[in-house]
């Protein structure tokens, strides 16, 4: 089952596709990392058969036998408020009136605490406890066969897999095609020219894309954005898991490159 705004690549694997709403098409709250609870109001209606996520989930829950009879998003928020003491003082009506309130907020008279642990931390000494972390080497290291390090990440213009930003004409016009970033030194060693194509290979796969020189990279490093399905960076990356966090090592692996 896939619930999304667009027919993304993931939808090709789905048995059921549920058309969902975008951020500007639904009511609710957004809580940022600064602990500010902000009220959001739908600016435009959902198109076609698309529905707000809450009502899709509510109806599925009812189909599974749950006693979910919410009629407005405020009912869900108030239920959540009853289970979270930190937002106890932030009622729905208060959000409608103020637009946003920062938690912890204990009661209606609390303006909201933008700074926590003002006097002390909740430790025996009252001070923050800092723990040194040990550096752990990646699972796969460069060698004579694959002498370079591949790093993957986002481009400024495209978010995650680009399901929204690659459908935004202005952003997609700036960065329309897959690209591989290579250091000036490695461009010279490999005989590459900016604007040409380069093939990057790992023990798991290969891809070919447009090459761009990047002086911010050190010799031996290359960077590939992971937002392009037509040159998917994860064809190359290592799926080895971190032993503690169980996070796959998609950001680092050994590769080699050559002119395409």
Predicted regions and their residues:
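Long, contiguous, secondary-structure-rich segments that constitute the structural scaffold
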Residues: 47-101, 161, 165-181, 185-260
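Short beta-strand/loop segments at the ligand-binding rim of alpha/beta enzyme cores
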Residues: 1
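Flexible glycine/proline-rich, aromatic-decorated loop/lid segments
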Residues: 5-41
């Amino acid at each position: 089952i896939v619930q999304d705004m667009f027919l993304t690549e993931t939808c090709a694997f789905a048995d059921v596709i549920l058309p969902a709403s975008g951020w500007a098409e639904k009511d609710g709250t957004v809580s940022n990392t600064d602990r500010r609870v902000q009220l959001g109001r739908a600016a435009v209606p959902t198109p076609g058969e698309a529905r707000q996520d809450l009502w899709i989930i509510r109806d599925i829950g009812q189909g599974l036998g749950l006693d979910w009879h919410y009629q407005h998003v405020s009912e869900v928020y108030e239920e959540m408020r009853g289970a979270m003491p930190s937002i106890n003082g932030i009622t729905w009506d208060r959000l409608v009136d103020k637009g946003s309130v920062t938690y912890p907020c204990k009661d209606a008279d609390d303006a909201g605490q933008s700074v926590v642990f003002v006097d002390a931390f909740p430790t025996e000494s009252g001070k923050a406890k800092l723990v040194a972390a040990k550096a752990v080497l990646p699972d796969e290291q460069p060698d004579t066969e694959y002498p370079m390090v591949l790093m993957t990440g986002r481009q400024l213009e495209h978010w995650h897999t680009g399901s929204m930003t690659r459908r935004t004409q202005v952003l997609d016009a700036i960065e329309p095609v897959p690209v591989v970033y290579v250091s000036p030194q490695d461009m010279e060693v490999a005989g590459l020219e900016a604007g040409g194509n380069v093939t990057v290979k790992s023990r798991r796969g290969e891809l070919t894309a447009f090459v761009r020189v990047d002086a911010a990279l050190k010799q031996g490093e290359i960077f590939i954005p992971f937002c392009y399905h037509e040159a998917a960076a994860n064809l190359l990356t290592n799926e080895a898991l971190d032993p503690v966090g169980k996070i796959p090592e998609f950001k680092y692996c050994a590769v080699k490159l050559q002119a395409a």
